[in-house]
Amino acid sequence: ALDGAFLCYDAESGRQYYDEQFSDMNAQRERLGMTIMLARYLQTHENEKFLAALKKSVAFVRREVYDAATGEVFNFADKYSAWLRLYNFPWVSLLLAEVYPVLGDKTLLSDAYEIMAAYYERGGANFYPNGIFVRELIETFKANGLISESEKLRTEFLAHVEKIVERGVNYPKHEVNYEQTIVTPAVSFILDAYLLTKDERYLAAIQPHLAALERFDGVQPHYMLNNIAVRHWDDYWFGPIHSFGDTLPHYWSSLSSIDYIKYAGATGDDERLRRGVCGLRDCLCLFMRDGSASCARLYPFEVNGVRGERFDPLCNDQDFALFFAYKYLP
């Protein structure tokens, strides 16, 4: 079932790590960021070993992660879900769109559309997904002849954005009640609606969300606290330390950074560009000189008797930050 999957890797023991019961350490969900990053790299580099690994990973995703007939995306291998997790759908759609320039298989794009259609059929318009760029999917479909699919997704997306604008800063709870990556999708989606339509009202609607997002940011001189959005529970879920406590940085902090970079590109806001680039570069400290990486850094000295001030040894899904760096750093 796991043939071709990219799994977590424990840098201390030198072994792969897999836990089907603890779903943040399985082969799906955020782990798909590894394949997304590899696809982005292979768009500009030639490497036969990496290409072979990508093909095996895509085969795994098609076999185990989603149903091409229905667009359903699953939480676990063998196309199994104990509950609906809408976060997963756009990530798989993004993965297929990133792989398309490498493999040139147009069914990847038609599958990417079906997944987004399934996402909206299951209530996605009331959800705030993170790490997804719907405008780019719309434009990719159009550029590759999927005109009807592009128009349908555009309609769904703009209706989704209208709900976000209407709701304002009364954010709905998701897997937690309130956190940084409930705000980042509001900024990203409203901004993409502006870039699609050039409707100036979106630039006005985005301002309260930008103000809310900035409240998560550290402004201290140390690189782990400088334009890094604070997060609290990530090392409990994504690393074997399993400790609560501020994770500074965690790769999802970079979602704030790319929102600032995209906003600067649309408006010419040089200060937000500086802050976005700074925060995204700071997140790259999760990648070590020896080629290993960390899912998060537990920042406090100690949390409930557990030693902190260290990088978690598990290489989990931090490759999203590297993907964003490839995509957005000047």
Labelled PLM ranges:
Residues A1-R62:
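An acidic-aromatic substrate-binding cleft motif
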Residues E48-Y87, G218-M224:
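Helix-terminus loop motifs that line ligand-binding clefts
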Residues A125-N126:
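Solvent-exposed loop/turn segments connecting transmembrane beta-strands
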Residues A159, K163, F189-P330:
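Terminal, non-catalytic domain-edge segments
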Residues H45-E64, L103-R122, L146-G168, K198-F216, ...:
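Extended, well-ordered alpha-helical scaffold segments
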Residues V169-P172, A264:
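Short amphipathic alpha-helical interaction patches enriched in hydrophobic/aromatic residues
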Residues F22, E30-E48, P90-D105, E121, ...:
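Well-ordered alpha-helical scaffold segments within catalytic/enzyme domains
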Residues L2-S23, T70-P90, I132-I147, Y171-D192, ...:
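Carbohydrate-binding/catalytic loop surfaces
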